[in-house]
């Protein structure tokens, strides 16, 4: 009986693993499975009280239907239209400078360190997603 319980817990833990693909699908509705892509960086660190951050960078050529899904979630056309200091910070953390073709989403949290940011550069085919909650 104990073996079945432990096996069940193990299966549950494996099925709940957060992957870049699952995060993008759940948060943005974008499904990269079936597309050619490579995850160049992934960080997903959270503590028990809910504070933490997620950062995903991937090389992927999104079809127009996925770009339309991002727009339906509030993404705006590039270039980034934010105050200059915020724009420079977003370009620096994403590594995507002066992009003009693609979409981005930025939402400031309640605290200065909190934000939700996504950018997709259609020229370089780079998708970057960052979420920070403190």
For the regions a protein language model found, what residue spans apply to each?
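Sec-dependent bacterial lipoprotein signal peptides
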Residues: 1-14
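A general structural signal for short secondary-structure junctions and capping/turn motifs
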Residues: 2, 50, 118-121
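Alpha-helix boundary/capping residues
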Residues: 11, 74-77
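N-terminal export/targeting and maturation segments
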Residues: 16-72
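Extracytoplasmic electrostatic interaction patches
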Residues: 77-134
């Amino acid at each position: 009986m104990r073996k079945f319980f432990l096996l069940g817990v193990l299966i549950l833990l494996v099925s709940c693993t957060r992957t870049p693909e699952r995060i993008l699908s759940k948060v943005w509705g974008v499904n990269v499975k079936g597309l050619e892509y490579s995850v160049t960086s992934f960080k997903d660190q959270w503590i028990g009280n809910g504070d933490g951050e997620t950062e995903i960078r991937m090389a992927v050529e999104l079809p127009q239907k996925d770009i339309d899904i991002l727009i339906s979630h509030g993404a705006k056309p590039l270039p980034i239209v934010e105050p200059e200091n915020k724009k420079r910070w977003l370009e620096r953390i994403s590594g995507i400078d002066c992009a003009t073709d693609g979409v981005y989403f930025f939402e400031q949290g309640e605290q200065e360190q909190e934000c939700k940011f996504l950018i997709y550069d259609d020229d370089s085919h780079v998708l970057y997603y960052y979420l920070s909650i403190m």
